[in-house]
Swiss-Prot record:
It comes from Shewanella frigidimarina (strain NCIMB 400). The keyword Signal does not apply. InterPro entries: AAA+_ATPase, ATP-dep_Clp_protease_ClpX, ATPase_AAA_core, Clp_ATPase_C, HslU, P-loop_NTPase. SMART domains: AAA, ClpB_D2-small. One of its GO terms (biological process) is protein unfolding. NCBIfam families: hslU, PRK05201.1. This is ATP-dependent protease ATPase subunit HslU. The lineage of its organism: Bacteria, Pseudomonadati, Pseudomonadota, Gammaproteobacteria, Alteromonadales. A double ring-shaped homohexamer of HslV is capped on each side by a ring-shaped HslU homohexamer. The assembly of the HslU/HslV complex is dependent on binding of ATP. One of its GO terms (cellular component) is HslUV protease complex. Keywords: ATP-binding, Chaperone, Cytoplasm, Nucleotide-binding, Stress response. GO terms for molecular function: ATP binding; ATP hydrolysis activity; peptidase activity; proteasome-activating activity. It is found in: Cytoplasm. The gene is hslU. The keyword Translocase does not apply.
């Protein structure tokens, strides 16, 4: 789990996301509170529940990007899902409980990787011994062999193996056969039976090992993975993963505004209000059955986000509003923000295009005036047509670089300076003509 302070988290987010300080501070505090809670006495810790967050802001201002970057910083089970993918229980489609099952799967994978990393040194030693056994098989009548000579030969080969002299030599080894997954579609409420059937089919079709002929360098990697997997206790692994999900799990619910009820409509609203009602117990705290065991959701942090252009937060059912107590509003982006987005973040758009053209031997230079004009053009198109936020910059940049990209392979050694004049020549007509902007940019 991440031990970063809120200030450090915001600093990391600043490297990728421009502006939106309120949203960054809220998620940073929420993430830090996960760590603070774990420092409390068990009795008090159980009573401290997470304060869920609702992020509100127009499309393309950084809501989803905050989630992506937070996932890397959290060092905890994290899942990002779109609320629109789910339907009410009893109808065709995914149930909201699948969110917790997917979160648990990611926690199991994360815990397995951590445990395999811990026992990697021991696994490397065992893999080395298995390769030496394949290179120097013991004779059948080994009762009369000279143990001293055998040990000396083994040490010579061990030295060669470690120095990489045997990397290209081929050997035959037994490696663990991959498990064949069986996907079973079952009606709602039958998940427990489905999990048991999947386990049964996996065990039936499971072959313990498979003989392969590999180069030693490839065989070594495969054997290290196999030996590390053998050293991991599967029961302990599942227990730790479930504990990790229950105490530190984070769910990011994107597009929550799309499941708001709009106006008066008759008939069942299976993918809107029905989904909201199904989300209530998850957010409030319930127990979900997964193939790894029962998972309690009482202390899982939920961060919801939505543009709320066609609806408003008050259109959510009151019970769900009450379970998202922290509201954060993200600001619409200005031309000045666009200029910063083009230059300041790590691996900014301009840096990416310069690096891509460098692979063809073409040098690209963006001047200050050129960057300002690109930002203005993107902002103008957003104002005149649909406002899609920073995503408009991708469209504008692709259109601007189209000609250079097409001819780059034939113009190795050339240099292009992208200034205000170049931008005007290539984009002015499209920006000024609203019909062209609507269809091309």
């Amino acid at each position: 789990m991440s031990e970063m302070t809120p200030r450090e988290i915001v600093h990391e987010l600043d490297a990728h996301i421009i502006g939106q300080q309120n949203a960054k501070r809220s998620v940073a505090v929420a993430l830090r509170n996960r760590w603070r809670r774990m420092q409390l006495e068990p009795e008090l810790r159980h009573e401290v529940t997470p304060k869920n967050i609702l992020m509100i802001g127009p499309t393309g201002v950084g809501k989803t990007e905050i989630a992506r970057r937070l996932a890397k910083l959290a060092n905890a089970p994290f899942i990002k899902v779109e609320a629109t993918k789910f339907t009410e229980v009893g109808y065709v489609g995914k149930e909201v409980e699948q969110i917790i099952r997917d979160l648990t799967d990611s926690a199991v994978k994360m815990t397995r990787e951590q445990q395999m990393k811990k026992c990697r040194h021991r696994a490397e030693e065992m893999a080395e011994e298995r390769i030496l056994d394949a290179l120097l098989p013991k004779p059948k009548d080994d009762w009369d062999t000279d143990q001293k000579d055998d040990s000396t030969t083994r040490q010579v080969f061990r030295k060669k193996l470690r120095e990489g002299q045997l990397d290209d030599k081929e050997i035959e080894i037994d490696v663990a056969a991959p498990q064949v997954g069986v996907e079973i579609m079952a009606p709602p409420g039958m998940e427990e039976m489905t999990n048991q059937l999947q386990g049964l089919f996996q065990n039936l079709g499971q072959s313990t090992s498979k003989r392969k002929k590999l180069k030693i360098k490839d065989a070594y990697k495969q054997l290290v993975e196999d030996e590390a997997a053998k050293l991991v206790n599967q029961e302990d692994l599942k227990e730790q993963a479930i504990e990790l999900v229950e105490q530190n799990g984070i769910v990011f619910l994107d597009e929550i505004d799309k499941i708001c009820k709009r106006g008066e409509s008759s008939g069942p609203d299976v993918s809107r209000e029905g989904v909201q009602r199904d989300l209530l117990p998850l957010v409030e705290g319930c127990t979900v059955s997964t193939k790894h065991g029962m998972v309690k959701t009482d202390h899982i942090l939920f961060i919801a986000s939505g543009a709320f252009q066609m609806s408003k937060p008050s259109d959510l059912i009151p019970e769900l509003q009450g379970r998202l107590p922290i509201r954060v509003e993200l600001d619409a982006l200005t031309a000045a923000d666009f200029k910063r987005i083009l230059t300041e973040p790590f691996a900014s758009l301009t840096e990416q295009h310069v690096a891509l053209m460098n692979t063809e031997g073409v040098t690209i230079e963006f001047t200050e005036s050129g960057i300002e004009r690109i930002a203005e053009a993107a902002w103008q198109v957003n104002e005149r047509t649909e406002n899609i936020g920073a995503r408009r910059l991708h469209t504008v940049m692709e259109k601007l670089m189209e000609e250079i990209s097409y001819d780059a392979s034939e113009k190795s050694g050339s240099k292009f300076v992208i200034d205000a004049e170049y931008v005007n020549d290539h984009l002015d007509t499209l920006v000024q003509d609203e019909d062209l902007s609507r269809f091309i940019l």
